[in-house]
Amino acid sequence: LPLGIVIIMVATIFLLAGHGQELCFTLFLSRKWTLALFFALILSYMVSPYTFEGVSIFWVPYLLLLSFSVYLLINLSHPLRSIFCSAFTAFCIFILSLFISPQPKGYIYEPFVIYSLVCSLLSIVFAYSRSSAIFNSIVSILVFNSILIFRGGYSTLLAPSAFTAACLSCCISVVPILLSQKITVFRTRRIFQTEAGSSLHPLTGKKRKRFKK
């Protein structure tokens, strides 16, 4: 594997693991300057003339982008933290998927489908409600597609694949969250029933009707 791919893989695992807090606080002291440099990196990538072949300096913006995303994950509020984590981590893994299938031949092997699956998994991990899961998925897809539009790559795949990615991401991210909420409610009712006695129904949580003799 090229050195840049290995660095991005390690940095992605580093980002998902949530380490590096002391390093980020040491390197980045001002949130305002961090956000300014972050948007400057995005603009520099959009107008960059480099491609994927044979350019070692091409990986430098990604490493800086990952370090800024770690800082944003630590310091920003919960909604922005979920959006940045979903967008940037999926963005890095999407780049890896380009090397796995640089010329997709089938509908399943399109890079956008791989990206949507990764984004869905991240939305499952970092979302706490149904609306935030859908919102984070759509926002991260729009962010990446807008970068590709300015970049000028994969223009023929943007329209159908973006719609497919949005549908897959929303559906896959919502179902496990709904299931986890049902399981949590059921467990809470069972615990409450154990503490209150056998007078509550285990599924509905309502009091059982007792017929007088």
PLM feature segments, named:
Residues 53, 103-107, 152-157:
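Membrane-interface helix termini and inter-helical loops of multi-pass transporters
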Residues 31-55:
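A generic, lipid-embedded transmembrane alpha helix
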Residues 1-8, 125-213:
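C-terminal transmembrane helix-loop-helix hairpin of multi-pass membrane proteins
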